[in-house]
Amino acid sequence: LLPQEVQTLFAKKTVHEDLAEIVSDGAMLAYVTALCRLETLLDRHPYDLSGGEQQRAALAKILLTRPDILLLDEPTRGLDAAFKAELAALLHDLLTQGVTVVLVSHDVEFCAACAQRCALFFDGSIASDGAPREFFALNRFYTTAANRMARDHLPAAVTAEDVIAACGGREAPKKERREPPPQPPKAADTPSAPPEM
């Protein structure tokens, strides 16, 4: 579980110590550290990190547990656009490996671009649900900025890329991760091989 208040996950004096308490496999630790772009932050106290850096460190700590079900509460909170794109790619990779991902978020643009299914909870119940395109296109209040701006002319547009494509423009090329993701290590002193990401 990645909680909304990620500071609750940190109990050690450095990011490295916090991560090392989860796994003793140095290769796995290096892999997840690189995946979450934490290499330059390992010697810092987790509370001295920015909000986005804390979010990445907390995500790394969760990934080291190799969950079959990944529960994320506001996972994009504090993240810059570049790492949001990397998070989207990472979640997609996890889904293709059979990991179930459930996330709660107010970041409707992220959900519209990344989710396989969306639901709106209201007063303890599911008020509406559906595939992202239908969910956001049919929702008058809880929808994306692109849908609000374009719905009178392009009712099915829910992302900026949808609007650009409908206007005859080309979608900007998707940015790759800053460098290729590290290769997962081979199983060492851990019970099962890490997910291939």
Regions inferred by a protein language model and the residue ranges of each:
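A short, surface-exposed alpha-helical micro-motif characterized by mixed small hydrophobic
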Residues: 111-113
